Swiss-Prot record:
GO terms for cellular component: nucleolus; nucleoplasm; site of DNA damage. Subject to competitive inhibition by the product ADP-ribose. Substrate binds at L21, R119, I120, G121, C122, G123, L124, D125, L152. It comes from Homo sapiens. This is ADP-ribose glycohydrolase OARD1. ADP-ribose glycohydrolase that hydrolyzes ADP-ribose and acts on different substrates, such as proteins ADP-ribosylated on glutamate and O-acetyl-ADP-D-ribose. Specifically acts as a glutamate mono-ADP-ribosylhydrolase by mediating the removal of mono-ADP-ribose attached to glutamate residues on proteins. Does not act on poly-ADP-ribosylated proteins: the poly-ADP-ribose chain of poly-ADP-ribosylated glutamate residues must by hydrolyzed into mono-ADP-ribosylated glutamate by PARG to become a substrate for OARD1. SMART domains: A1pp. SUPFAM superfamilies: Macro domain-like.
Amino acid sequence: MASSLNEDPEGSRITYVKGDLFACPKTDSLAHCISEDCRMGAGIAVLFKKKFGGVQELLNQQKKSGEVAVLKRDGRYIYYLITKKRASHKPTYENLQKSLEAMKSHCLKNGVTDLSMPRIGCGLDRLQWENVSAMIEEVFEATDIKITVYTL
């Protein structure tokens, strides 16, 4: 059962929920970070691969770092933010920013209003959440897209 943590601070577009990301509303699109090689062999990426498959479909999109690959599953979009070249590399804030911009653009073109994600880039990738969350706020500032971040 997901429970809301300290409802979004004044003016924040991010809502924090303690619970299972995959228990989010079925109408929410999902997002997480991967590498260009689409390995998804560790962290939450393993669960995305198991739940949504489509590795070849993602590889066929030939996306590079700073771009976003997309799968459509059950009427919603699953966003794969490409933040690094290989699974063994670490992402840069610059590539994360570019891939967030690419995702925002796809969301706006396709009528996505609700987006759920983990603390992207902050698990195995070691980016700092305070920087990542500020970046998400900035990228999605002028949109009506509601973002929910799930933590365990």
